[in-house]
Amino acid sequence: MEEVQPPVTPPIEPNGKRSEASLLDICEKVLSLDGSTCDEALKLFTETKRILSASMSNIGSGTREEVERFWFAFILYSVKRLSVRKEADGLSVSGDNEFNLCQILRALKLNIVDFFKELPQFVVKAGSVLGELYGADWENRLQAKEVQANFVHLSLLSKYYKRGFREFFLTYDANAEKNSANSSTYLLDSYRFGWLLFLALRNHAFSRFKDLVTCSNGVVSILAILIIHVPCRFRNFSIQDSSRFVKKGDKGVDLVASLCKIYDASEDELRIVIDKANNLVETILKKKPSPASECQTDKLDNIDPDGLTYFEDLLEETSISTSLITLEKDYYDGKGELDERVFINEEDSLLGSGSLSAGAVNITGVKRKIDALSSPARTFISPLSPHKSPAAKTNGISGATKLAATPVSTAMTTAKWLRTVISPLLPKPSPGLEHFLKSCDRDITNDVTRRAHIILEAIFPNSSLGAQCGGGSLQAVDLMDDIWAEQRRLEACKLYYRVLEAMCKAEAQILHANNLNSLLTNERFHRCMLACSAELVLATHKTITMLFPAVLERTGITAFDLSKVIESFIRHEDSLPRELRRHLNSLEERLLESMVWEKGSSMYNSLIVARPSLALEINQLGLLAEPMPSLDAIAALINFSDGANHASSVQKHETCPGQNGGIRSPKRLCTDYRSILVERNSFTSPVKDRLLALGNVKSKMLPPPLQSAFASPTRPNPGGGGETCAETGINIFFTKINKLAAVRINGMVERLQLSQQIRESVYCFFQHVLAQRTSLLFSRHIDQIILCCFYGVAKISQMSLTFREIIYNYRKQPQCKPLVFRSVYVDALQCRRQGRIGPDHVDIITFYNEIFIPAVKPLLVELGPVRNDRAVEANNKPEGQCPGSPKVSVFPSVPDMSPKKVSAVHNVYVSPLRGSKMDALISHSTKSYYACVGESTHAYQSPSKDLSAINNRLNNSSSNRKRTLNFDAEAGMVSDSMVANSLNLQNQNQNQNGSDASSSGGAAPLKTEPTDS
């Protein structure tokens, strides 16, 4: 079979002298680093030179000069992070020179967005070298994900602050006074003062747990301070006129309550944060606080002064410059990787343009995929630029009656659910849950509460366990960290008990018994439930220091374990906000696409029982999981740890038969089948939002008992059929993988505008690969296999579809990560045994040619050319099928996405229409755009005639289409939302599409899509 050729780029010269000289110049002349740091950077460059040469075409634009600059940045950042850690451990002493990531990027003329887009390749490909030089824990010490999360959070918070400032204060170009220049300068200074005071609050008061919700409260507290200190003439609102302010009797407006109403904040929490901000003003700026009730100033007119603090001359035009200098110095003294002041300077090229994926940060919002970092050219034209909407009048607050949802506002709304629904619950099992716990073979209430305390303490440690992550200089920091951790533990614990009780009730209904001993005494089940509860709390507050999969590492479970409870968790908590449901769904998708296939996954412990033929390869690759650390070991770690990694530090393991073993480990080879536990997965959907499109019969069926999902793999399946629990679990797991692959294949087919036959062939090919060449997915991403399946089917079908086109369209998929096609894992030892020498990770074209095709060629040949023979189809059509109807697809049922394309040739879209919407949407002028099942599209016709007419129109593209639906490729798509705007908008879209198509000349073979906004 013909091989696809990877692009050729000039390698780094063998001696690398020119590159080393360039790196040395940057270290010595630009960054002024000391000799030891320069030597360390040169050593790391020398060790990774071979990797750099092999990665030239995959980094940045592929030019040697740009690739070198990126590689230098990766090396300097690694040396900075890892050598500083060495100094802290007392192993070495670095020089007096201090540098951070922003200085590195400025020296190399790179921006933060591009740096973090390319960094994962360096982490993957140079990981072995970094491990040899800096130790096995180098990745945790590098903190690349934490710094990226910090950048994303600051981008969101700066926009949140900018938006709030513009709502309450005038923009400088809206001031038409004679001294407009001075007024503009003051407003800019006030804007900068607020941001610097927020950074001081964030660095001093939120040192370790810089979560988005707490920081959002910090932004709101800064707005409160600005409102009562900025002169009234700069306000963009009138307290007396605004309906959004909460009035407190005759005393005036309750400012804190009003801000909580506007921003969905907690009044108690906001008052605490305001007090901390006031303390910083007193400590750093040396301003004397006074109770607002004792001050006479027009800034407090019509505002209830109770509980407010006022600082004389804090933001007067004569003193603000001095305050700015003091805050700048305070910020400079607190060293960090990012210069967080740049986020209010829209002209700073360091921020970069484009978007940075927030997947690692799990930022949820109104859309599943969010451009967390928009282009500064659009967003930061001016920090105080006026609203573009004509509705933005002088009274900015009353004019903006409903703010559009943002990631920050969504986080605040979700936190409100925790505050109002979960927090009022008792932090112990309810009487209903206690009934189930006491109905077991013995009363296990104490066991459940003790486990919850230990596991949640491990996930949310006190400051003594996490001091190495801290910053800031004020003594109240540790106390606030401990309070924050205790609040999060309580929230997770209450949520855990609430959902556990609901699950027990459902399980008792299925089993017709209250004794759930098998489930409730299972250690792994409870840890999965606690991890899921804690992850929801972390996702709500969006922390920087505890990103997923932190809950897996700290509880001792694996990705495969957690995937067993996610869908059931969603099902049994009805009040769960939509954004948290989406988070769990996307998390399950992330687990299934790659994490369950990683080395050390407990999935392999079931796979060698269900598929004994794979046991040898699994053992040779060292893929099996280690036993799960015991609860006593985790408890001892909490009591004596100095903050080290939980998973890697635990030595004691469970030996009791009732405690299910298995934690991810790249080192242990477990060959005792009797120790393999916990692998039955009884859930039906990998991604509930997208894949829970089951038929009515299936949706009414009771789910299998939960306890069977956590039974020993070698145990016979209680449901019968002669299978072990491992075989049943792997079959269900493969079904979920196939469903996830079906959705992604369907999305790619629509983007590439391929036929239904190609879609079915790609899906069948993937099914065969999963079932018969399962090892191709070991330590890889399922998208890598899907992309190879597309190209393989294209070649066997003699289609003119290149890998370049496939990857180009894959980039537009919401789940796309460049690392998927730039870095595919290959077993270097196996390659050497076969006489090939190469790196551990290669690009997808090399993987396709050297690994994929040799393994699947017999399967691909079986598919044969994809035929579109109408005669064959007619001879084999099912009995009773309507003449001319397309054949029934073997492709699995996927969700009804609105609108859904049903033809690869014509622009035909189908959107589900509820009966409640029909009368409102379908008027006489728009009815012809819809074909409703059971309702005729023409007078005096039957539904069967309508269906036949639709088939004839689809199958006869040359017929006269007078007064019929327009199926031309240039016709505009009509969706539900467009119908409400009547025919004018539809005709405009058709004319626009037609002019675009006619002006484009030759049509491009690839489908063009609008970019995400």
From Swiss-Prot:
Residues 406-607 are annotated as: Domain A. Residues 406-858 are annotated as: Pocket. Residues 979-1013 are annotated as: Disordered. Expressed in actively dividing cells. Detected in the shoot apical meristem, in young leaf primordia and in both sporophytic tissue and the megagametophyte. Highly phosphorylated by CDKA-1 during G1 to S phase transition. Once hyper-phosphorylated, becomes inactive and unable to interact with E2F. Ubiquitinated. Subject to proteasome-dependent degradation during sucrose starvation. InterPro entries: Cyclin-like_sf, RB_A, RB_B, RB_fam, RB_N. GO terms for biological process: asymmetric cell division; cell differentiation; cell fate specification; double fertilization forming a zygote and endosperm; embryo sac development; endosperm development; G1/S transition of mitotic cell cycle; gametophyte development. Residues 728-858 are annotated as: Domain B. Belongs to the retinoblastoma protein (RB) family. This is Retinoblastoma-related protein 1. The gene is RBR1.
